[in-house]
Every structure is written in structure tokens, then in C-alpha cells.
């Protein structure tokens, strides 16, 4: 599974990049949303109590939602900051164990954006938000009211 096209060999045209993005949405993002909307979903990050549990936690949530969240992060901080942050992370932590926060810190330094604060909500919680937008006009001005709730596939 590819999260992003090979960043050193970008697609040769806007059309190829668009094909890649479309393929990602149909193959990965939709699957992640479907599974993450179920009651038996789980966060991307899960504590492992025993090595025998490791295989159990790598499922479509881990891979598809994980890939979707990384794609969202890439779009949030931009390609240059993403590449710079990943290079810093891989260089600083090569041959070492790390925590998720180490990755967020490298990407935060490269981008100047609050990566840890934003991304922790996506990796430590199951599900995703459903945003409701209400539009009305008052005294000639358009007013938007946004509310959000956790989306559940069963409607509850």
C-alpha cells in the first residue's frame, strides 16, 4: 500500500497525480472510514501488553486509517515540510526505538505547525467527526454554524 507517491519520483503529470489520489481514496480512505465507524473499531495507537498481541492490532484500522491520517498530515503541513521533517526524524532516530511523539516533534519543527496537538486526536481516538453546517442570512450577512459529533455507522 502506498500512502504517498514516491516523493523523489513524483508523478509525471497532474493527471497521474490525480489518478494516484483517486486510487488512494477508493482503495484506502473509504475502507478506513467504513471500519472506523463501527462500534468495534479501535484507535491507531494501542498499548501492547504482551508481544503475542502485536499481530492482533495490525488490521485495516492500523493500515488504512494510518495511511489516511498520514496523507491528511502531509496535506496539512505541505510537501516540503513533510520531507524535511521525515528526513530529520529518520536521521535523528536511525537504529533506535521511538515514540509517536518523536515523529510529531520532527514534523512540528519542520513545519512550524502544532502537529502533535492536531495528530494525537486522530491517532489516540477511534472514529471520526461528522460535521454539520447550517447556513442562514441575517441582516444581509451569511452566518455559518458548525457542529460536530462522532460518526457511527449504526446512526447512534
Residue ranges of predicted features:
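Hydrophobic alpha-helical and helix-loop surface patches within well-folded domains
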Residues: 1-149, 153-155
Amino acid at each position: 500500500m502506498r500512502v504517498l507517491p514516491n516523493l523523489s519520483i513524483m508523478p509525471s503529470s497532474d493527471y497521474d497525480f490525480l489518478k494516484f489520489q483517486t486510487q488512494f481514496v477508493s482503495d484506502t480512505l473509504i475502507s478506513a472510514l467504513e471500519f472506523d465507524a463501527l462500534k468495534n473499531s479501535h484507535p491507531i495507537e494501542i498499548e501492547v501488553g504482551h508481544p503475542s498481541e502485536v499481530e492482533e492490532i495490525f488490521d485495516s484500522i492500523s493500515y488504512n486509517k494510518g495511511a489516511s491520517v498520514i496523507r491528511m498530515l502531509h496535506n496539512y503541513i505541505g510537501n516540503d515540510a513533510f520531507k524535511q521533517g521525515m528526513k530529520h526524524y529518520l536521521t535523528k532516530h536511525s537504529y533506535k526505538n521511538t515514540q509517536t511523539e518523536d515523529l510529531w516533534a520532527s514534523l512540528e519543527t519542520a513545519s512550524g505547525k502544532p502537529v502533535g496537538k492536531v495528530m494525537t486526536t486522530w491517532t489516540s481516538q477511534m472514529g471520526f467527526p461528522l460535521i454539520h453546517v447550517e447556513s442562514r442570512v441575517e441582516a444581509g450577512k451569511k452566518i455559518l454554524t458548525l457542529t460536530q459529533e462522532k460518526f457511527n455507522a449504526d446512526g447512534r
